[in-house]
Curated annotation (Swiss-Prot):
Keyword vocabulary terms for this entry: Acetylation, Cytoplasm, Diamond-Blackfan anemia, Endoplasmic reticulum, Ribonucleoprotein, Ribosomal protein
Function: Component of the large ribosomal subunit. Required for proper rRNA processing and maturation of 28S and 5.8S rRNAs.
Molecular function GO terms recorded: RNA binding; structural constituent of ribosome
Organism: Homo sapiens
GO biological process, one term: translation
Protein name: Large ribosomal subunit protein eL27
CDD domains, per the entry: KOW_RPL27 (cd06090)
Family membership: Belongs to the eukaryotic ribosomal protein eL27 family.
Pfam families, A to Z: KOW, Ribosomal_L27e
Disease per UniProt entry: Diamond-Blackfan anemia 16: A form of Diamond-Blackfan anemia, a congenital non-regenerative hypoplastic anemia that usually presents early in infancy. Diamond-Blackfan anemia is characterized by a moderate to severe macrocytic anemia, erythroblastopenia, and an increased risk of malignancy. 30 to 40% of Diamond-Blackfan anemia patients present with short stature and congenital anomalies, the most frequent being craniofacial (Pierre-Robin syndrome and cleft palate), thumb and urogenital anomalies.
Length: 136
């Protein structure tokens, strides 16, 4: 069977605090490492989705409703459900990597990077389905 957990693939988080949220694989580790001897992936996802906007709303209200809260986390493959979709959101690999979990300041920076890139993509109007809450 081919490897399908690749960077850019959209996954659904199944377990934990962010379960039911959509995320994108930033880096996948199929063979595991010494500290995590199982296949896992570094993902960046959306914690709080942007709210619905209409034409009648003003600029300020639209700006407020278009905010996104993101998360960066390492997940076991068992806790991720891959979808057939992929998005090409260019996250900076020097900022968003596995080393960010050692230092809270770096983690904040990585989360900020993901937030900025997600909001940028949301404002262009591409990948609309990615920025909508999963209805379940």
């Amino acid at each position: 069977m081919g490897k399908f957990m690749k960077p850019g693939k959209v996954v659904l988080v199944l377990a934990g605090r962010y379960s039911g949220r959509k995320a994108v694989i930033v880096k996948n580790i199929d063979d595991g490492t010494s500290d995590r001897p199982y296949s896992h992936a570094l993902v960046a996802g959306i914690d709080r989705y942007p709210r619905k906007v209409t034409a009648a709303m003003g600029k300020k209200k639209i700006a407020k409703r278009s905010k996104i809260k993101s998360f960066v986390k390492v997940y076991n493959y068992n806790h991720l459900m891959p979808t057939r979709y992929s998005v090409d959101i260019p996250l900076d690999k020097t900022v968003v990597n596995k080393d960010v979990f050692r230092d809270p300041a770096l983690k904040r920076k990585a989360r900020r990077e993901a937030k900025v890139k997600f909001e940028e993509r949301y404002k262009t109007g591409k990948n609309k389905w990615f920025f909508q809450k999963l209805r379940f």
